[in-house]
Structures are given as C-alpha cells and as structure tokens.
Amino acid sequence: MTIWFDMDGTISDLYAVENWLPMLRAENPKPYAQARPLGNMQMLARKLNKLHRAGYTIGVISWGSKESSKAYLEAVREAKEKWLDKHLHSVKWDAIHVVEYGTPKENFKLGAEDILFDDEERNRESWGEYSFDPSQIMEILSALG
C-alpha cells in the first residue's frame, strides 16, 4: 500500500506566501521554496518513517503551476524536492511525482487501497475510497500503525 501526499495546501502552505500567485504567473519558483510547513513536520516524519519500516510505500503527487512551460515545471519540481528535503529530510520517499497541473492523481495509484491526502476536493473525489483531507493526516497515519 502506498501513502500519497499532495504538497500545496496539504503539507506546504504555498497559499500563505505573500504574492504567491503573481510570482507563479511570472514563472518564479520561489513561493514553493518559501512556503512554511503545515503541521508538525517532525511528528509527521516520525510517523512516516515508522510506517515505511513496517512496509508501507510513501510518495508525493503534486501539481506544477497552472500555466507553466516545461522549464518552469522542472524548476518547480526542483523547488518542491528541496522543500521536502529541508522539512522532511529523514523521510525516504519511494516516489516523488511533480506533474503538470490538472493531471489526474488517480493515474498514479498502485493499488486499490492506496491512500491520498489532498486539500483539493475534486482530487479526493476522483481518487475514490481512501482519500482524505489534510486535517486527517495524523489520525489516519496513527490508525495505520
């Protein structure tokens, strides 16, 4: 079973970065690097590492900016990977997918019981069962082990 995380609005507070939208429209990746974590990253890392040791696969499925060149998508991918390394350094990610905006996240499902944490309701609806709002992250992870 894989536990998947969206980033923006789920574990990363992109939308609180001042002028985030104009910067994204100007293809500036800084807001992705500047975003503060949402929640206690040390506690999240401990839970994820425990679950990883128990055999769970851990991954990220995150969209790039809505209007994006290929070069900007690559810059966003790099910024998001650096953010993960900075804030969840001890977590061994099995997969990190930073994909074009709007790519169906369910395309990355590896099994029927895969879990998705995502702030976008439409992503949770299209994922189906085992998709959760970010407010449920610690509750669900604790229930898994």
For the regions a language model picked out, list residue spans one by one.
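A structural signal for isolated positions on well-ordered beta-strands in alpha/beta enzyme cores
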Residues: T57-G59, H97, I115
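Alpha-helical substrate-recognition element adjacent to the catalytic core
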Residues: T2-H87
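Acidic, Mg2+-coordinating phosphoryl-transfer loop and its flanking beta/alpha structural elements
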Residues: G111-G145
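Conserved beta-strand termini and adjacent loop/short-helix elements that scaffold enzyme active sites
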Residues: I61, V98-Y101, P134-S135
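Donor nucleotide-activated moiety binding/catalytic core segment of transferases
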Residues: W93-E113
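Lumenal/extracellular "mature" regions of secretory-pathway glycan-modifying transferases
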Residues: A75-E78, V91-V98, D133
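The start of beta-strands in P-loop NTPase/AAA+ ATPase cores
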Residues: M1-I3, E113-D114
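Metal-dependent phosphoesterase core characteristic of DEDDh/y 3'-5' exonuclease domains
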Residues: D85-V91, P104-N107, E120
